[in-house]
Each structure stands twice: as C-alpha cells, then as structure tokens.
Amino acid sequence: MAVVVALLINPVGLVFWLALGLTIWFAVNRTDRERRRYLRAIHPKHPEIGRFFWIGLVVGALVSLVMVIGRLQISLAALLALSGLTLVALLFSKWRFSPWWLGLASLAAVGQSGLLAEQHAANLAILVGLLWLTQAGLARFNRGDEIESPVIQQDRRQRQSAAFELRQLFWVPLILPVAVENVSNLPLLAVTVQSLTFVGLPLLLGATFMTPRDRAQTAWRRSWPWYGGAGGVLIVYGIVARTMTLPLLVSLVFPAVVSLVLVGGFIWQGRQVHLTVTLADQGVVLIGVVPHTPAAEMGLQPGDRVLACNHHSVNNSRELYDAIQKEPTYCRLRLRQADGELRLAETAIFAGAPHELGMILFPEETA
C-alpha cells in the first residue's frame, strides 16, 4: 500500500511520466502520419510538448495558491482517488481524454463521518470546481488550430472524408493542504507547517479526441460552457457546505452527479453535426493549412473549397498547380467556404516556390 501511495501522490510520479510519454508519442506520431499522408508535417515543431509543461505549471500554481491561502484541506482518500482516476483516464487517452470524471473522487470518502469529513468533502468540491473552471478557460481560449490534425476516413462506398484530431494534455502539479494525521508514516513528499501538511498531487487537464462532425479546435471550445457552469456550481456548493450544516452524504454524491451530467452533455454535444469535410467532384477541398504560408495569410480554413485559381477553374491538384504556374508570384482564389459563402482571396507567393501554397488536401492532392 505504501508503494502505491508513493507512486500516485507524487508530482513527478507515475502519472507524470506516463502523461509525458504519451504526449511525446502523440506529437511524434502526428507528425509522422502527416508526412506519410500529406508529404509534410502541418506543425513540425511539436508545440503540444512545451504546452504540457508551462501551461500546466501556471495552472497548478494558481489552483494551489487558492487552496493553501484558504487552508482548504483534502482527505488522503480523495487525493488517492483523484490520482487513480487520472491514471485510469490516461490509459484511455489514445481514444479520448476529458476530465469530466474529477467529481467522482468525492465517492472515495463514503463510509467516513464527522465534521472533519464534511469539511473535507466541501473542500474537494471547491477543488474540482476550480479545476473545471480552469479547463473551461483552456477550452475557451485554446489555440488548438496549432495542433489540430486531419485524419482521412472512408465510408462503405470508399468515399473519402476528413475527421479532425486534437491531443493536448497539461500536467498540473498541485500542492494541497492535508490533515497531519492523514499522512503520518506514509512515504509522501510532504512539508508540515503549523499543523498543516502540504502534499504534492499530479493531475491532468486538456483533451484528446477525434471528430468527423466539426473542427477539433471548435469542438473543444464548445465544451467550455459545460465546464464553466459545472465548475461554478461546485464552487458555490462547496462554499455553502462549508458555512452551513449539510449532510455528508449530499457532499459525497453531489459532485459525482455533476460529473455524470457533464459526460451526458458531452455525449449529446458530440452527436451534433457542425461541419463535414468530404472529397468533392467540383473544386479542390482543403483539410488543413500549414502556418506561415500563403494559404494561412489568405485565411483559408479546413472545409473551404477552391473553385478557381488565377481565373482558371480547378477540380484537382494538377489543375490547381497548373493554374498557379500561370502567375507564379501571385495567387488569386475563388472559393466556397464551409458555410456556403463565396469569397475571393489573394496573396503573393514565395519567390521561387510557387508550389508551396501550404494547402493540405486529400491524399495525392496536396499543394
């Protein structure tokens, strides 16, 4: 048991190393796949690795500061539950990761009793609320377009379409106050100050998923009202539970119920269709845009369909390339956006490299 505790409640323990390894693997796998399918990596510098560290560290410092200043102690059972749930979620992060399950940690205190247990349960609700509010902020202000990657899919009729994948994890190391009696004689990285013991806890925020029904960055952004609302509700509940006498059972069940409401909302949201990108007979369909290229300067987006280039109609990459050669230092496009609107776009082209527009098209059609 002591070894399990030491592995789980340690900012640089099992959760950290597994998350770091997965983040590196996600990033390298993404660039390798893009080079195989599209002949280039859309984002070759692996920005998701740097963000794993610095964004998570900032978030961890802010949340820890609130918990320490407020002297909001958490039970050891809740800490173990949070770390254990994080570890389980990591095992499934290849397919999907979303920290909706944080509220389930409240159930770890079932069987406890007394005023101290009630305070710990209320404090846990506040902690989970803060983490969900942070997740809402990350989703709302995300720059997921920098790590969004198109994935080619085929239906039963062999028609090609594009899904969009986003894999971004944030390591959030927390320093949390725990009652001294909870951690005595346990192998923890802990510091005791004035009857409070501060213990390190590794958590993860972020998202990993693939969707054929929307851009990945906008799909993640749509989750922020859910997380923001749930986080606000839990913080208010935790404050009320600390100042009023509420049954312990309510404080144990309420965060778990909110977690289930969250995941139900995400399942419903995931079934909504906002964008479908399929290979078309007319025009050339974009499924990605390389940053800092003429395509990016023109504001092109996945789902846009190029109908004409330099006043020549185009229906495939060969026709697009030939049209670019008509005016090798400038590019004028007529395109239909994903919302159906027609617009014109134009920009200068890199001198001596008219083929490097930065458009990612369906395989064998990259320009």
UniProtKB/Swiss-Prot annotation:
The chain crosses the membrane at residues 2-22, 49-69, 72-92, 97-117, 119-139, 186-206, 226-246, 248-268. The main function of the Min system is to promote the disassembly of the cytokinetic ring after cell division, thereby ensuring that division occurs only once per cell cycle. MinJ acts as a bridge between DivIVA and MinD. May modulate activity and localization of MinD and MinC through direct interaction with MinD. Residues 261-339 form the PDZ domain. The lineage of its organism: Bacteria, Bacillati, Bacillota, Bacilli, Lactobacillales. It is found in: Cell membrane. It comes from the Bacteria. Pfam families: PDZ_6. Keywords: Cell cycle, Cell division, Cell membrane, Membrane, Septation, Transmembrane, Transmembrane helix. One of its GO terms (biological process) is division septum assembly. The gene is minJ. Coiled coil: none annotated. Belongs to the MinJ family. One of its GO terms (cellular component) is plasma membrane. It is a multi-pass membrane protein. It comes from Lacticaseibacillus paracasei (Lactobacillus paracasei). This is Probable cell division topological determinant MinJ.
